[in-house]
Amino acid sequence: MNYPIKEIRSDFPILSEKINNSPLIYLDNAASSQKPKCVLQREIIYSSKEHSAVHRGIHTLSKNATKNMEDIRSKIAKFINAKSDSEIIFVKGTTEGINLVANTWGETFIKKGDNIVITQMEHHANIVPWQLLSMRKKVDIKYIPLLPSGKLDICKIDDIINNNTRIFCITHVSNILGTCNLIEKIIKKIKNNYDIKVLIDGAQAIMHMKIDVQKIDCDFYVFSGHKIYGPSGIGVLYGKKKLLKKMPPWEGGGGMIKKVCLFSGTTFNEIPWRFEAGSPNISGIIGLGKSIEYVKKIGIKKIQKYEKKLIKYALLKIKNIPNIKIYSSEINTSIIPFNLKGCHSYDVGILLDKYGVAIRTGHHCSMPIMNFFKVHSMCRISVAMYSDESDIDNFIKSLLKVQKFLRRFN
């Protein structure tokens, strides 16, 4: 496979940095990915030469900034194959996107006697907003359970979803287990039998695989910019146009109105601007547009193929470490969760950092998964398009040193 890993790595300045006098080995990409030079440079150019408010001014800077923002909306629509640019809403990130749906669609269409279905492998961002809604609306939440393999027990769907289910919320890829759910198959199964809306948390999928929202046939899809080599504080909510049109605004302010009158009431803007109150994160939008350009230039299918090969390499290496527990046999994306027996994940992470190795430890904002596996925390490595075999080799070498050191205290 002709994958330009050297050229790609040279595009990411942070990979040349040293941490604690050791070369940085960055394996925390599921938490946040790094930015290529083109994204960093584009943000600087915008902030230093192009900055202005959008949708407000008649002057050149404002008109250009508005055009750039709307062009990027169109670019994102094409990237995930949305039918219309108006189906793309800019939000702060995945968390805000899910909260927007819960607080607009959920508040409008979910009533007492209905139920919400989510899965046991969700990030807290796809659990807590629905719990809050369920408390307000007095409705039940049901859960699709996990299997020890790290897969969802899809056979239970028919027992859990019923005619009172209004929305099914599911992660595309588990942020801990690395499991890629068969979204298209699951949605088809559900929609063949029920009139149910489906929301997908795509935070861990967007940078690793081709997303086609029309083919998937989801009603909502959310992701964050910093997961796909872009800036923090910017994300995208995709929603089917016919649903967005029926949803009331969530936040009020400038940009989301057509007319404000003190006595006869306010009329709201068309979608998607109805959901974008106030001044947007224009710099973040500009950076996200450039990061998507970069991913398209490399090729998302090429990236997926490369990462799949790399994670297999990592899995083979890590399995050879004695007294290690890997928490999923269904690793098919970019993530490996593990613990060293007799060692706390916090200690492992702190000591790896001494060797310049960055991993994630803790409950990963997914406590229900921790409870399922009867642990308080896990270690997690996660790769990206710029990760390579030397990253894995250095990680393994450092992990063995950490294990040897911690063994002295057991």
From Swiss-Prot:
Q: Which PROSITE patterns would you find in this protein's record?
A: AA_TRANSFER_CLASS_5
**Recorded GO CC terms:** cytoplasm
What EC number(s) does this enzyme carry?
2.8.1.7, 4.4.1.16
Question: To which species is this protein native?
Answer: Wigglesworthia glossinidia brevipalpis
Checking InterPro entries in the record gives:
Aminotrans_V_dom, Aminotrans_V_PyrdxlP_BS, Cys_dSase_SufS, PyrdxlP-dep_Trfase, PyrdxlP-dep_Trfase_major, PyrdxlP-dep_Trfase_small
* Gene Ontology biological process: cysteine metabolic process
Q: What does this protein do?
A: Cysteine desulfurases mobilize the sulfur from L-cysteine to yield L-alanine, an essential step in sulfur metabolism for biosynthesis of a variety of sulfur-containing biomolecules. Component of the suf operon, which is activated and required under specific conditions such as oxidative stress and iron limitation. Acts as a potent selenocysteine lyase in vitro, that mobilizes selenium from L-selenocysteine. Selenocysteine lyase activity is however unsure in vivo.
Q: Where is the active site?
A: C365
Q: Which PANTHER family does the entry link to?
A: CYSTEINE DESULFURASE
What's the protein name? Cysteine desulfurase
